Amino acid sequence: MVKRVISCLLVIGLLLFAALSAKADEGEPFKMYTTAYHHGEITASGVPVRRGICAVKREWMGLTAIVYEYKPDGSMGDMIGIWECLDTGFGGDADGDGVGSIESGKVIDMYFPTLEECRDWMEQTGGKVYVQLVDAEG
């Protein structure tokens, strides 16, 4: 129960920030909030959860997310990693419009096997990243 509360608090804390404008022009990096999850067994795409999978808005499913650090001055830093967009989710509804933060494309939610790794991710990124979406199939 405590782990679930901590996970929820991490998400809520991020949603209190002003929304970053996220436009998903494929191939162009853009700013996003990031969260992390460690629960569940099967993704929205039907594959088992595993390291290297992220949850995004449904329209981005099947794409690949190349994630870069968000530097303190707001500029884009080094590449952090590559994730497959194979899951989706709702995320918190910060503005009350009935559309969650993941669903709206404001947040990318990374899967990690443990709560500790989720916390490490949040500490490493500060909850903000740059994301480049590419169609890397084939």
What do these predicted ranges mean?
Residues 1-5:
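Positively charged n-region of N-terminal signal peptides that target proteins for export
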Residues 8-17:
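Bacterial N-terminal signal peptides
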Residues 8-9, 22, 46:
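Compositionally biased regions
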Residues 25-138:
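Solvent-exposed, well-ordered loop and adjacent helix/strand elements within mature globular domains
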Residues 17-26:
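Bacterial Sec-dependent signal peptides at the C-terminal "C-region" and cleavage site
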